[in-house]
């Protein structure tokens, strides 16, 4: 079975590439230095600094492997080419919460780069799934954990 594609915006791709570069060039050196300094302290069997540095090294290598895997299976959305007649990945969408009369704005992204605190929601999230394919003035209804939410699509635009 083919691996699932990791859908990324160009911004998300660039962030991952930058993080990978930092991990490989800077973080690896830093943790190697910490391990070297901890070794110089002598007995490694009761050396908390050594254990912490080795744990950090494992975390760094695991993150490098994770990013490599994401990038290997990446499908980049060209945001300039996104159709804004309907909500798609890469769009910026402004919606109205019909219960509270609040306007919300989200960028629809792939699950890898979703971050609700930054207004980026995944196309696989309940709200993202319901919004994909919606048009301006459409009302969508979502049920999450037994609660019903209604949103009206106010505007769809390119995110850049």
From Swiss-Prot:
It comes from the Bacteria. Pfam families: GreA_GreB (PF01272), GreA_GreB_N (PF03449). Residues 36-55 are annotated as: Disordered. InterPro entries: GreA/GreB_C_sf, TF_GreA/GreB_CS, Tscrpt_elong_fac_GreA, Tscrpt_elong_fac_GreA/B, Tscrpt_elong_fac_GreA/B_C, Tscrpt_elong_fac_GreA/B_fam, Tscrpt_elong_fac_GreA/B_N, Tscrpt_elong_fac_GreA/B_N_sf. SUPFAM superfamilies: FKBP-like, GreA transcript cleavage protein, N-terminal domain. The keyword Transcription regulation applies. Residues 2-81 form a coiled coil. Keywords: Coiled coil, DNA-binding, Transcription, Transcription regulation. The keyword Lyase does not apply. PROSITE patterns: GREAB_1, GREAB_2. GO terms for molecular function: DNA binding; RNA polymerase binding. GO terms for biological process: DNA-templated transcription elongation; regulation of DNA-templated transcription elongation. Necessary for efficient RNA polymerase transcription elongation past template-encoded arresting sites. The arresting sites in DNA have the property of trapping a certain fraction of elongating RNA polymerases that pass through, resulting in locked ternary complexes. Cleavage of the nascent transcript by cleavage factors such as GreA or GreB allows the resumption of elongation from the new 3'terminus. GreA releases sequences of 2 to 3 nucleotides. HAMAP family: GreA_GreB. Belongs to the GreA/GreB family. This is Transcription elongation factor GreA. The gene is greA.
């Amino acid at each position: 079975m083919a691996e699932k594609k990791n859908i990324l915006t160009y911004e998300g791709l660039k962030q991952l590439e930058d993080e990978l570069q930092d991990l490989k060039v800077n973080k690896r050196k830093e943790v190697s230095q910490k391990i070297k300094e901890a070794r110089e302290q002598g007995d490694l069997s009761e050396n908390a600094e050594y254990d912490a540095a080795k744990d950090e090294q494992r975390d760094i290598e695991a993150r490098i492997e994770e990013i490599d895997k994401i990038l290997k299976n990446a499908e980049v959305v060209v945001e300039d080419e996104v159709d804004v007649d309907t909500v798609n990945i890469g769009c910026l969408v402004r919606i109205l919460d019909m219960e509270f009369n609040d306007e919300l704005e989200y960028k629809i992204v792939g699950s890898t780069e979703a971050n609700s605190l930054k207004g980026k929601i995944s196309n696989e999230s309940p709200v993202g799934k319901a919004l994909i394919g919606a048009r301006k003035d459409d009302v969508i209804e979502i049920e999450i954990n037994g609660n019903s939410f209604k949103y009206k699509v106010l505007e769809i635009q390119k995110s850049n």
